[in-house]
Amino acid sequence: LYTCRRHCARRFPGVPLFLLGHSMGSFLVRTYLIRHPGTVDGAILMGTGHMRPGFLAVGKAFAAHEIRRLGAERPSSAVARLSFGAYNRTFAPNRTAFDWISANAANVDAYVADPLCGGNPTMGLFREMLRGLSFISRFEHLKRMDPATPVIFLSGSMDPVGEFGRGVRRAFRAFQKAGVRDAAMKLYPGLRHEILNEADRERIFGDLFQWMVQRIPGAAPTSEAPPHPASPAKSAASTRYPQ
């Protein structure tokens, strides 16, 4: 990420740089803010969460046991059951195995049909993800962030990754406690994990646009929304990103 940031700064000198991360990408952005403080003009954290230390400890112990038994590089259906399966139970009776992704049925269907989405991750990946979550959860690490970098948390109120808002609030409060002076949070009622692919995504793009403009030095205030993106139904396949 830092290499990409340097490339963008060289190619677009003087242009403000904001870093957006969704889901696992939000955890990577949080790692970036710790390791490279003060190198972006703002950060947007979407679909994030904040797991409790006890859960992380149990998860790492389970991963270590499974890796000793099966190895680190073999895909594991257990990981999918423990994560995606648990997420989906909230929305039973389920139409698909990924109803938790979105309240927009067309978006869910595009996800299911995409061969790059879903599947069983390896236990090694699960272990590394838990290690990363532990890293970004430690207060002594959060204190390394630049307190002047604006951060906004955006999530759906029905996103199980953020524990339906509870995990998002914990992450938000942790940033405030670490001294981040411009931390904001917004939960969208009824929306699930992929808020930028929900039917109401134009409102979210507008909120994000306004937040960014207000944090660009010298930018003229505006009440205008950005150009409307294509409707989710028409663009679901072209805007699909692997989870």
Question: Residue spans of the language-model regions?
Answer:
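Conserved acidic catalytic loop of the alpha/beta-hydrolase fold
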Residues: 1-15
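Gly/Ala-rich beta-loop-alpha elbow adjacent to hydrolase catalytic centers
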Residues: 20-25, 29
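Alpha/beta-hydrolase-fold enzymes
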Residues: 29-116
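Active-site nucleophile elbow and catalytic-triad environment of alpha/beta-hydrolase enzymes
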Residues: 117, 121-143
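Short, proline-enriched alpha-helix->beta-strand connector loops that line the catalytic pocket
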Residues: 145-151, 181
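Short beta-strand/loop motif that positions the catalytic acidic residue
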Residues: 153-155
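Conserved alpha/beta-hydrolase "acid-adjacent" motif
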Residues: 160-170
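Catalytic active-site module of serine/aspartate enzymes centered on a nucleophile-bearing elbow/loop
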Residues: 182-230, 234, 240-243
